[in-house]
Amino acid sequence: MSLKINKLKYASMYGPTKGDKIRLADTDIIVEIEKDFTVYGDENKFGGGKTIRDGMAQSSTATRDQGVLDLVITNATIIDHWGIVKADIGIKDGKIAGIGKAGNPDTMDGVEPHMIIGASTEAHGGENLIVTAGGIDTHIHFISPQQIETALYSGVTTMIGGGTGPADGTNATTITPGKWYIEKMLQAAEAFPMNLGFFGKGNCSTEAPLDEQIEAGALGLKIHEDWGASPAVIDASLKVADKYDVQVAIHTDTLNEAGFLEDTMNAINGRVIHTFHTEGAGGGHAPDIIKAAMYPNVLPASTNPTRPYTVNTIDEHLDMLMVCHHLSKNIPEDVSFADSRIRPETIAAEDILHDMGVFSIMSSDSQAMGRVGEVVTRTWQTADKMRKQRGDLAEDKGNKNDNFRAKRYVAKYTINPAIAHGISQYVGSIEVGKMADLVLWKPMLFGTKPEIIIKGGMIIAARMGDPNASIPTPQPVLYRNMFGAFGKALSKTCATFVSQASIKNNIAEEYGLEKMILPVTGCRNISKKHLIHNDKTPEITVNPENYEVRVDGEKIICEPATHLPMAQRYFLF
């Protein structure tokens, strides 16, 4: 016997289904579920009087070796680069085992053989929750260890960058220089509930000092103008990167001391490179570093202080810049240096270039002009600002939803940074076989405050009420680390990314590492065309007199925002 119920009642019980629409937080971004992998009438739900019980949705006979899951997230709405769908998510051995229909094949239709719910299965209700892949932030100044929990609680599960603590070199540059510091930072990484990876110093015009850092465990090299970003340095770093299959990230030469943008591009010579804050407010050839985004070998990123362009952006940046780069307001040359980097015209253009899919990656620049806990929020604020100012994307016209725009923006802090740094086989999307790094959101809090962060298949952090309360929800509700973040579980739920060469050198044994170490691969055979939904390479020009930006000959400009969604109303407490 079947039962017909209206959509509102169905959604309240099992979450939205195909054709239903969801507003993301208080933005104007509306997504529509494209496909429902669950089976009507055979839905899974845990709780008193619900279906996940012995002999019903839970198999009475299947063992773990016969395909029983460790964890099932039921009826979840997934937002990922590949689609916006509703499905059960199955997790086993810390990895995503299935996306589809879970349950008991003896009593239910459509259950996938690798998604059996049994006595070995934990359950979490994904009804009326959105699930995204854990965020990846590739521009981290490791200044303070407290950044890591702040990032985790915002929905970031992988942090890549460099540093040694609050030394002036780290305050300004994302670099962990030399074997001794690389070893110490890899040892420190053992303590943190986060996937981590460290850049060595790429600022050297000969190869041997760079080789030894990759051999020691750096996952890539970072070139920064504060150490000198000359063509010789760029060439040497890229030669070493090609030799070891690692990525090079670059903060180019704001002062044009060793050459102009064209000289840097000639030194790069068609080799793949990840450009940081490619608009230029965070640093880079003034005034036209933004042109780098048109090259097919450049993987262009933004940092979040310029995201999105608002009425407060310019004033805030000048003060931040003086502090972060050890400048003095009493030295005229320092003030001129700061002024040259902060250009309203290029910051406004950056908004539009993100919306067009020309800029490909979002990151933070943590404590060094960027906010480590705001990568996700700033990404969706930019999407909303562009939705309001530019309307439908061409790909969304006629669909009465913003699905393509949502896929484009979520890719900027998930799959694309993973591809850029050779870790997309492990993280960056909700796909079978990848590490189960998942973030669960209530739609009204999407992009601001996650409900639960799952890391390597285990809940690692969550919003949690008073531990002395009779139920989990009484205030004060704070983000707290959960069991996945403690003891030896941490070393199995989190990974450290290193070079292939360092694994061959057996650094785990030499340094005494217990955390999973995973090699980066495929960093040198990629280009911008591999960056999903963000692969456009139009011609970009910048007028050196008034900083006007044109794309394929058309001037691009937008007004600064005076109000933003996902802002103060979410962070009063």
From Swiss-Prot:
Its EC number is 3.5.1.5. PROSITE patterns: UREASE_1 (PS01120), UREASE_2 (PS00145), UREASE_3 (PS51368). It comes from the Bacteria. Gene3D superfamilies: Metal-dependent hydrolases, Urease, subunit C, domain 1. The modification N6-carboxylysine is found at residue 222. It is found in: Cytoplasm. Pathway: Nitrogen metabolism; urea degradation; CO(2) and NH(3) from urea (urease route): step 1/1. This is Urease subunit alpha. It comes from Flavobacterium johnsoniae (strain ATCC 17061 / DSM 2064 / JCM 8514 / BCRC 14874 / CCUG 350202 / NBRC 14942 / NCIMB 11054 / UW101) (Cytophaga johnsonae).
